[in-house]
Each structure stands twice: as C-alpha cells, then as structure tokens.
Amino acid sequence: MKEKVTAVVLAAGKGSRMHSDIQKQYMTLLERPVITYALEAFEDSSVDEVILVVAPGEVEYAQKNILDKYSYKKVKRIVTGGAERYHSVYEALCVIPEENYVLIHDGARAFITPELIEFCIEQVKKYKSCVMGIPVKDTIKIVDDNCYAVSTP
C-alpha cells in the first residue's frame, strides 16, 4: 500500500483566552475565516488527505460554512473532537490507517505555508517525527504580578 500523508487540522478549541463568542478558527481575517488559510495551505501541498476536527455540534456548521463554501477537495472527513486537545487528536487518529504519516496542525494558526508543510513531510519521512517551530517575531515582555513590564528578553 502507498504511504499516504494525512493532515489533522484541529478546530475544536474554544479559544477561551480570546474572550469572544466566536472561536478563533472561525473569526474573520481579511474577509475569510482563520481556519481557511490553514486548509488552503494543506490543499496546495502534497498532503493526500485532511481530517478536520471540530467541536461537538459544529459538524454541520463546518461542512456548510467552511468545506462547501470554499470547496476543499482534500478534506475527506469531519470528526468530532473531545474536551481536551489530546482527545481531539485521538479521535482523528482513530480514523487514519496506521501506515499513514500524520501531520497535526492547529486550525487557529493561519500562517502555515505549503513550503513549511513540505518540509515537515520530508523530515517526518526521514526521522519518523517532526515538530515545527518558527522564531518569534513580536516583542515579548515579561511582567510582574501587577502586569507591569519588568524586562524584555
């Protein structure tokens, strides 16, 4: 059997730190939901298929407002996630054949590119495991208990 690469895009999170009624992955960024940028990057990569993981009760919403509206061909299945991220990953892994390579991506992270995806695929095939990280570009401030900036690393 041909080795396939499956991407799991996690979109079941609540984004509670955002203090918004709209989950991060569904917020609008330049007139499109944030999650569409990640899905488009996987669509434009050599990934064979995508499994989208959404919160309970959101399957119909994701199908209509994301998949149908933007016509993603590689999203083969929508899976309902769990209470925690690891539950959602587990639910997706349960529907993927063992011989597949698996990439896991947070759907609220819009700035993944097909080039980064290809790099991950190369590395996971070579080393059997890969974690992608990119340098922080924003200024980071360390604050004290009263939220006063105390230093910039």
What are the residue ranges of the model-derived segments?
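Conserved donor nucleotide-binding strand/loop of the catalytic core
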Residues: 68-83
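Glycine-rich phosphate-binding loop at the start of an alpha helix
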Residues: 36, 82, 86-90, 114
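Active-site nucleotide-sugar/metal-binding loop of Leloir-type enzymes
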Residues: 87-101
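Structural beta-sheet core signal
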Residues: 7-9, 52, 104, 129-132
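Conserved core of the sugar-phosphate nucleotidyltransferase
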Residues: 112-153
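N-terminal glycine-rich phosphate-binding loop and ensuing alpha1 helix
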Residues: 2-59
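Residue-level signal for inorganic ion chemistry
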Residues: 9, 35, 92, 105-106, ...
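Acidic helix N-cap motif at the loop->helix transition within catalytic regions
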Residues: 60-66
